Amino acid sequence: MAAAVSAKLVKDLRDKTGAGMMDCKKALAATDGDADKAIEWLRQKGIASAEKKSGRTAAEGAIGSYIHTGARVGVLIEINCETDFVARGDMFQELLRDVSMQVAACPGVEYVNTDDIPSEIREREKAIEMGRDDLDGKPEQMKEKIVEGRINKRLKELALMEQPFIKDSSLTVAELVKQTAGKIGENVKVRRFTRYTLGEGIEVEENDFAAEVASMTKG
């Protein structure tokens, strides 16, 4: 099966669907290299054509809000699309609600993407990791590689789009947005969000909001 998934097959599928290279590889691997079935696989996942749409201007959209049970956590989020018609549609509104709940469930998330994280945060994390005792005595090249892996892991923890989707942990938020874009036929972008916590800055007993929000999505 692996031999059938050649670079040419991947390129051809990418040209036909506009899907990302890794998505094309996954589709071909899942369908034993059958291009037609791979296209259907991508369509079912909502991935086909989503990549081609990602470069188009998304100036419409909506600002969504979510207030967690007990009114202790609130979220405002802006998600953009290309047309007001799509912004009013059920699929876009569902995405808006789902990602709002995701933010509420992820108190450690501060940025939309890892690219949004300021360089000073990256440098601070590097300094912390380089100073850890478990790196003592390791060759410099190995130390750099270990530190890089740890930093990347930490940066992903800070980025909304890298989080496992609370309703389906097999998807990241980025993949959820990409699937929605493919299904509605427009570019969709999460632009910004703000998370409010009642009594923030005051020493209070903390609860597991992530577990509470996740439990609300079940049943």
UniProtKB/Swiss-Prot annotation:
Record-linked CDD domains: UBA_EF-Ts
GO molecular function, one term: translation elongation factor activity
Cellular component aspect of the GO annotation: cytoplasm
Keyword tRNA-binding: no
Primary location class: cytoplasm
Residues making up the signal peptide according to the UniProt record: none
Keywords: Cytoplasm, Elongation factor, Protein biosynthesis
Gene3D superfamilies, sorted: 1.10.286.20, DNA helicase RuvA subunit, C-terminal domain, Elongation factor Ts, dimerisation domain
A Pfam family: EF_TS
Location within or outside the cell: Cytoplasm
Region span, Involved in Mg(2+) ion dislocation from EF-Tu: 83-86
Family that this chain belongs to: Belongs to the EF-Ts family.
Role this protein plays: Associates with the EF-Tu.GDP complex and induces the exchange of GDP to GTP. It remains bound to the aminoacyl-tRNA.EF-Tu.GTP complex up to the GTP hydrolysis stage on the ribosome.
Record protein name field: Elongation factor Ts
Organism field: Synechococcus sp. (strain WH7803)
